[in-house]
Amino acid sequence: MHTRFENAFQQLSASLQDALGPLIDKPDFAAMLTADEVNAVCEASQLDVDALAFALLPLAAACAQASISNFQVGAIAQGLSGNFYFGANMEFTAVQLQQTVHAEQSAVSHAWLRNERGLRAVTVNYTPCGHCRQFMNELRNAASLRIQLPGRQPAVLSHYLPDAFGPVDLQIDTLLMDDINHGATLQNVNALTRQALDAANRSHAPYSKAISGIALETASGNIYTGRYAENAAFNPSLPPLQAALNLMNLAGEDPSTIKYAAVVERRNAVVSHWAISQIMLAELGCTDVEHHFIEE
């Protein structure tokens, strides 16, 4: 078991420890449970799906990197597939606070990067901030998305974000988590860049059209990709680097182990992620970063 989970694991009931232990003891446990695993844990622990999501919040919060606030937030995104995806806040020193990944963003992007096509519910240990409410409003099924908080009745997102501004106000009908491929190509590039290109092709950028993706390779040889997730309100948009760093953190790898990175974006786009990605990666100790342009 990854050391970050040890204290939180001890908070669980004995039956839940017995059911969950073999799963999180796996060296490759990546802070998610498949639908079959969720069902098996529910049966063994005598919990329903929503109760299990609440019970897992301490484990999700244990993934937080809250070096500035020291405030750990955990979230569980329940996919339409039945899978559970952990999320946790992630803060970065030496750059702007705007680079922070919020726990709800973390769980949603985690699900998206694992090719989930929609969410039933997001369970979180603290009330979602306005930033996160707006971020979740970009989802295809935002109208039916349930928000679940300890000590409160479940409520749909619109309860927390009434009279919302969203994609429909900008005549946008392609939404976050839709299955999309922009079809861009690059010639004569390495495997890492091809993964960054694939991420760019699956990014959500209907407002700026500035599709972008990134791929990070660690010292262990693992590769983590990130896609740009744009938002109708602009500021809650999640850059591709943050999406990749979040996936890496949830998988239990230290961002300081990144050795190589590749950024792919559209040439002459109105939005570029290159400069801030380069700065943040340098702060993490990675200076071997390739930059590739998709031609118009």
Swiss-Prot record:
Reported cofactor(s): Zn(2+)
Binding site for Zn(2+): H102, C129, C132
Catalytic reaction list: cytidine + H2O + H(+) = uridine + NH4(+); 2'-deoxycytidine + H2O + H(+) = 2'-deoxyuridine + NH4(+)
GO cellular component terms, A-Z: cytosol
Sequence ranges assigned to domain CMP/dCMP-type deaminase in this UniProt record: 48-168, 187-296
Protein EC: 3.5.4.5
Chain residues that bind substrate: N89, M90, E91
Cofactor note: Binds 1 zinc ion.
GO BP terms: cytidine deamination
Keyword entries, A-Z: Hydrolase, Metal-binding, Zinc
Active-site residues, Swiss-Prot/TrEMBL: E104
PROSITE patterns in UniProt: CYT_DCMP_DEAMINASES_1, CYT_DCMP_DEAMINASES_2
UniProt GO MF annotations: cytidine deaminase activity; identical protein binding; zinc ion binding
Entry-linked NCBIfam families: cyt_deam_dimer, PRK09027.1
Subunit structure: Homodimer.
Function: This enzyme scavenges exogenous and endogenous cytidine and 2'-deoxycytidine for UMP synthesis.
HAMAP family: Cyt_deam (MF_01558)
The name this protein goes by in its record: Cytidine deaminase
Organism: Pectobacterium atrosepticum (strain SCRI 1043 / ATCC BAA-672) (Erwinia carotovora subsp. atroseptica)
